[in-house]
Amino acid sequence: MKEIFDFNSNIKKNLLYLFIGGAILTIIGLYQVINSGHGHEEVSEAVGAYSSGDGHSEFHWYHRLYSNLWINVVYFLGISISAIFFVAIQYVSQAGWSSGILRVPLAIGRWLLPGSVLMLVVFAITNHDVFHWTHEYLYDKSDPRYDYVIDGKKAYLNLPFFLGRMVFFLGIWYLFYALILKHVAREDKLGGTESWQKLFTISTVFVVFYAFTQSVAAWDWVLSIDTHWFSTMFGWYVFASWWVSALALITYIIIILRDNGYLTFVNHSVLHDLGKYVFAFSVFWTYIW
């Protein structure tokens, strides 16, 4: 059974309205940040506290813009890679119930490439304002702003190694995604079990690779924003937030498609299974909050 989504002018118009509304709200938010003296003082105190009270940093309105932009880039890229992880889990577990809905998480995974490019661009623009450890004076013992804690992490937290990890993780993740897409299309075209066996192998390797690299990515992209603080549970926390968000998005899109006449073969049992997924990992996320 073949279904083709009709991306008609009405849908495009509604998306345009949402985009315009988001842009207006962003402008209003920036205006409030720029012109709110009370908020300025509060954030200045927070930044001062973060800088160990030595006045290392001075708050500017664009710091809040940069930090929110970075976290959103990380969040939506995390949803994208988690959707791919969902597909891999289905092949590794040899699940049959989800075979009719895998096109949805595969489509969400398409954000991985543009999201990766956007992440590199945003990091290039915002790294000194978001990541305190990128300032060279923190490693100079003759400078009064020297930070022995951050200097002790220099072997790991340095720009070449950080960027190398970022490019490596994003590149290998996309490679796995491209391989999964290739063999899914091949399976649809040729049938049989050869492509399925390859998908099983690729997905197994990807799940193992992702289990390690996702935690390291969480340390790099989120935890290192506050270099003095650490948590042994942080990788799990970020995984849970990405994973449950991806599950919720997958479920939401499937419901919307069914309500508009698509995915008619998806029955209530499938929706019930997705609901159990979302509920279970919402509880898990709450537990490690």
Where in this protein do the model-derived segments appear?
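Transmembrane-helix bundle segments that line or gate the permeation/cavity pathway
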Residues: 33-45, 73-189, 203-206
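N-terminal regions that are enriched for targeting/export leaders
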Residues: 1-79, 150-157
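Alpha-helical transmembrane segments and their helix-start/interface "positive-inside/aromatic belt" motifs
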Residues: 3-20, 67, 71, 99-117, ...
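Hydrophobic alpha-helical membrane-insertion segments
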Residues: 20-27, 109-129, 280-289
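Short, charged/polar, low-complexity loop and linker segments
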Residues: 59-60, 86-88, 262-269
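Generic signal for short, ordered secondary-structure residues
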Residues: 64, 68, 80-83, 87, ...
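Long, contiguous internal "core" modules enriched in hydrophobic/ aromatic residues
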Residues: 15-16, 26, 43, 153-289
